[in-house]
């Protein structure tokens, strides 16, 4: 069960002592399945970046900013930023870690995500390296977030199947109607596909391979590209599955008494933390076909 996994007790040294991205993907899927109200993904990725630094050993939780700081030194909408003691991110071309007091509150209407704006310059600040070193951490975040979205999708499907077996119309369960069956039949395949892509991306990240993007032969083992692919596909699947599940719940799907509304909101909110999906799609296209981009410039 989720409490038995002790997800929030992961120390900065855990990743370096044996936990792989694939291991963490399994735990992240469980966190998504139960909508764990903790910034597990952000903490796991950021803690790995701080491994071996004794001065940060007592910091918990830690997180990372997905976007570089603006001209005023502000990291916007940091996932886990409302509760994190340390934030890692890019500021003025450098990868930095900043320790400061978290605000303890988050903006409303953000799917209950503990996000917040944080300063990249106020607090105890340490330079960890060049901005380019953040690329791998961001890829790890995408893969683990994709895993949480797979967990959301899997539970949303279970809720739908359970409901259509319990809800009766015309004296029979609505799950016996062919239209309902057809609406749910294709979802397991989509969820399994997203899970497979997540674990493929995690395996490539764990291999530390530089990778390649041979789209002509469908031979892609570039960790950065696979991370984006896993994230985008899992986000799309989660939105589709939760939409279908909520639809078959009928009017009850919008009621707070039914859990599907929680999964519906978080499937969209968690996927948008990175930003507009179209931007990520364009970045992935540039990764696949960099010469096309250069030729158009």
Question: Where do the protein language model's features map onto the residues?
Answer:
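FAD-binding core of flavoproteins
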Residues: 35-158, 162, 294-297
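Alpha-helical interface subdomain recognition
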Residues: 1-34, 136-297
């Amino acid at each position: 069960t989720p409490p038995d996994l002790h997800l929030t007790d992961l120390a900065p040294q855990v990743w370096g002592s044996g936990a792989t991205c694939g291991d963490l993907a399994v735990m992240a899927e469980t966190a998504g399945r139960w909508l764990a109200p903790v910034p597990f993904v952000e903490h796991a990725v950021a803690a790995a970046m701080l491994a071996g630094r004794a001065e940060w050993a007592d910091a918990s939780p830690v997180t990372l900013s997905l976007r570089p700081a603006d001209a005023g030194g502000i990291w916007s909408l940091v996932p886990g930023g409302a509760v994190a003691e340390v934030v890692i991110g890019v500021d003025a071309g450098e990868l930095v870690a900043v320790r400061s007091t978290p605000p303890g509150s988050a903006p409303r209407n953000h799917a209950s995500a503990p996000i917040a704006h944080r300063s990249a310059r106020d607090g105890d600040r340490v330079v960890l390296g060049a901005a380019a070193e953040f690329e791998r951490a961001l890829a790890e975040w995408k893969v683990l977030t994709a895993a949480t979205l797979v967990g959301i999708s899997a539970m949303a499907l279970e809720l739908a199947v359970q409901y259509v077996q319990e809800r009766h119309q015309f004296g029979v369960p609505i799950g016996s109607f062919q239209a309902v069956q057809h609406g749910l039949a294709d979802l397991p395949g989509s969820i399994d596909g997203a899970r497979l892509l997540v674990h493929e991306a995690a395996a490539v990240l764990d291999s530390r391979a530089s990778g390649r993007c041979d789209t002509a032969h469908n031979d892609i083992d570039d960790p950065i590209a696979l991370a984006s692919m896993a994230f985008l596909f899992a986000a799309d699947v989660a939105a589709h599955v939760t939409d279908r599940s909520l639809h078959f719940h009928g009017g009850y799907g919008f009621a707070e008494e039914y859990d599907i509304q929680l999964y519906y909101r978080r499937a969209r909110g968690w996927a948008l933390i990175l930003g507009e999906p179209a931007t990520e799609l364009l970045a992935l296209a540039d990764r696949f076909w960099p010469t096309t981009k250069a030729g158009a410039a």
